Amino acid sequence: FLVGNLEYLGLRLDLGYNLVSILSLAGFLMVLYGISYRMFKSFWAGAAAIVFFFFRSGTAFWHYLWEHLQAGDLVRTLEENTAFIGYTTNENWGLWNFNVYLNQRHLAFGLLMAAVAVWTFMDWVEAGCSHKEHGFLWVRNRFFTKKAWICRNVDTAILLGLFLGLTAFWNGAALIGGLLILAGLAVFSDGKLDYVICAGLAVLFSELQSKIFVSGSVMSPSFYWGFLADNKSISGVLWYLVEISGFFFVGMIVAAVFLKRGQRAVLMGCLLPMAFAFLVSLTPDINVNHKYVMISYAFVTVFWGWIVRCVFLAGKNSWKKWAGRAAAA
C-alpha cells in the first residue's frame, strides 16, 4: 500500500519498493545496534553484531569446501555454482541466507517494530535485574512481590501493544517472534502486567485484522518436535542445530555463564523464537518456521558481537593481544 502511494506520487515502482525495504532494514539494524550499545557500552560490539547479521555461522560452506577439495574441482565448481549451498533438508532453498529478507521485504519492517518493543521493555528488565538479592531469593521475588507485577508505565505498554498488533498486517512471524522475546524478558522483569497489556492488545488487533482480511482459519497450532531435523532424537536435533548455525546457538548457551544477570535475561528472550521453531507448527508447512530461527539469529548477534570484541581486546602483552585478535578473526 505504501509503495503504491509512492508510485502514485510519481516515484518509480521498483525504486519505491526498494526504498521502503532499505529503510526498514536500516532501521532494524540501527535499533539492533542500540540494544547492543545499551547492554555493553561498546561501539565495536554493536558494529560486529551488524556484520554477523549479514554473515552467519554455519557448516555448509566448509562441508562444500572439503568435498570439492577432495574431488579437485573446487575452483570450477565455485565459478559455475548457481544454487545455494546446503546439506540439510531444504537448505538449498536459501532458508538460512540473507535472501530471506529480500524475498520477504515485509519481514524487516516487522522486525523493526519488534526490536523497538524489545529496546523499550529493556527498562523493565533493568528494573527487575537491579535488585540486590541473589539466587533463588531473587527468582522468587520476580514472581511473588508487588513490584514484580504492578504496572510501571501503562501508556507505553498500550502504545507498544497497538504497534505490535498492527505489525501483524505486515508479517505475522515478526509479531510472534517479538512476543516470544518479550515473554522471555517478562520472566525476569518488574511490571509484568505491562507485558500482559502489551501482548493482549497485540493479539487482539492481530485477530481483528485476521477477521477483516482473511477468510477461514489463519493458524492451526500443533506440537511438532525437531523442525526439519532428520533425526528427531535430542542429540539429532542438537546436531542439526550445529549443522545450520555452527557454534552460534550452542556456543552462546555455554557463553551465557559469563554474562551478567540482565544480559542473560535478554539472551533467554532472544532464544525463545528458535526454541519455538523446534517445538510448534502453526501451519501445515513446517518450513515456514525458519523465520523464527532467523529472528533469534538476528538478535543473538548482539551477544556474539560483544564476545568477539572482548576476545579481540584480550591479553596484556604483545603475543597475547595478537593471539586474541587471531581467535576473534
Q: Predicted regions: what is each one?
A:
Residues Y33-E91, H131-G135, K146, G324-A327:
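Transmembrane-helix signature of polytopic, membrane-embedded enzymes
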Residues C198-E207, C310-A329:
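Signature aromatic-anchored transmembrane alpha helix within multi-pass, membrane-resident enzymes
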Residues A127-D155, S189-I197, M252-L271, A314-A323:
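Membrane-interface helix-loop-helix junctions at transmembrane boundaries of multi-pass membrane enzymes
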Residues F98-N103, R142-W149, T156-N171, A183:
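Membrane-interface alpha helices of multi-pass inner-membrane proteins
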Residues L19-S42, V116:
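Transmembrane-helix motifs of polytopic, lipid-linked glycan transferases
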